[in-house]
Swiss-Prot record:
Cellular localization per UniProt: Cytoplasm
Function per UniProt: IGPS catalyzes the conversion of PRFAR and glutamine to IGP, AICAR and glutamate. The HisH subunit catalyzes the hydrolysis of glutamine to glutamate and ammonia as part of the synthesis of IGP and AICAR. The resulting ammonia molecule is channeled to the active site of HisF.
Name of the protein this chain belongs to: Imidazole glycerol phosphate synthase subunit HisH
GO biological process: L-histidine biosynthetic process
Active site: C77, H178, E180
TM helices/strands, residue ranges: none
Gene source species: Blochmanniella floridana
Segments forming domain Glutamine amidotransferase type-1: 2-196
Amino acid sequence: MKIIIINTNCSNLSSVKIMLNKLGCNTIITDDPDLIIQSDKILLPGVGTANTAMKQLKKKNLIQLIKKCTQPTLGICLGMQLFGSFSNENTHTNTLNIINVPVKHMYSPTLPIPHMGWNNITILKKHDLLNGINNNHYFYFAHSYCMELNYTTIAYTNYGQPFSSVIVYKNFFGVQFHPEKSSFSGEQLIKNFLEI
């Protein structure tokens, strides 16, 4: 199986690769369009700002390629947010518009933003991506922006407000948390993705 991590020049690429290697996967970090097209699975991790990530994808001529991918593609944290229509970060940043849902800054009158640390998910719809995972499983989050619950949401998390923590749309899968930092639960989710 050919597994590609799209090189967005973000800081968590190597930690995602380490987890995949631990699971016995042959994984390449690349921005080569030919390698991406020929892959069996794609991961789009991201840390930082939507504006910076979109500039990188545009510079590498990857925007249309990602949108046209037919193989299973997993967006992690910012990578999931990039699947949305736009982010209100820096007033307005256009993203990949794979799903017609905006990404908005989180708000809580009592909790600190960004949302940092462990939190559980509440599953709304059964899906192969969540096999072996239930509402008691905790994942590691680190984000200030989120997607509200929408037609692609299969699990959500509460942090001052409910937000989408797992989404599925066609061949695109997204998780707001970091599976590579989420111990057993994260490893189980990645295994499930690899089996889809």
